[in-house]
Regions:
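Beta-lactam-recognizing serine transpeptidase/beta-lactamase-like catalytic domain environment
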Residues: 2-184
Length: 184
């Protein structure tokens, strides 16, 4: 979804944009295929996401430069501490885009080639679910004194990742995957 949101936000694709997706895709000597066998197909971007097609994701995702891919990963918090109020949080791993090899520059488009924590992953989806705004994770919503007085903690302002329109498009893409695609 990170790649989809970046592409849609930058105006490089829409859910209804149509692509000719090959059975296998070879770019820069790197060959990509999908988890299921298929011939060449005409697919909308929504259809590519619907069936989690690595070939289609790389085909469309290469519209983003390597640096743009890296910047979107970092913007969403991959390889960064989330700021949650717990000790022992891991940062995750993302190599600088200038150090990506011939394969990693493409696998990052479909979620491989980086190491992110489950919380970092949840934060990506949380931002899309919050109309494009990523909120800082927190454990404590309120503190209740011994006398029963509740002290609500203020919610910190979030950071805009994508527009409300892009977030809504991504939510629709995800709903389609769950209702009709490979996540059912």
């Amino acid at each position: 979804m990170l790649t989809a949101s970046a592409l849609i936000e930058q105006g490089l694709t829409t859910p209804t944009s149509v692509y000719d997706v090959p059975a296998t895709l070879t770019i820069d000597g790197q060959t990509f295929k999908d988890a299921f066998e298929h011939g060449a197909q005409r697919r909308t971007f929504s259809g590519i996401i619907h069936d989690s097609m690595n070939t289609g994701t790389v085909l469309v995702g290469q519209k983003l430069s390597k640096e743009e891919r890296y910047n979107w990963l970092k913007k969403y918090g991959v390889g960064e501490f989330t700021g949650i109020e717990l000790t022992g949080e891991e940062q995750g791993i993302i190599a600088d885009w200038r150090d990506w090899d011939g394969r990693q520059q493409y696998t990052v488009l479909f979620g491989q080639g980086v190491a992110q924590t489950p919380l970092q992953t949840a934060m990506i989806f949380q931002a899309l679910g919050n109309k494009g705004v990523r909120l800082k994770p927190r454990i404590v919503d309120a503190i209740i004194d011994a006398d029963g007085t509740e002290h609500k903690r203020a919610v910190e302002p979030g950071e805009r990742m994508v527009s409300e329109e892009t977030a809504a498009s991504c939510l629709t893409l995800m709903e389609n995957v769950v209702e009709q695609g490979h996540a059912r």
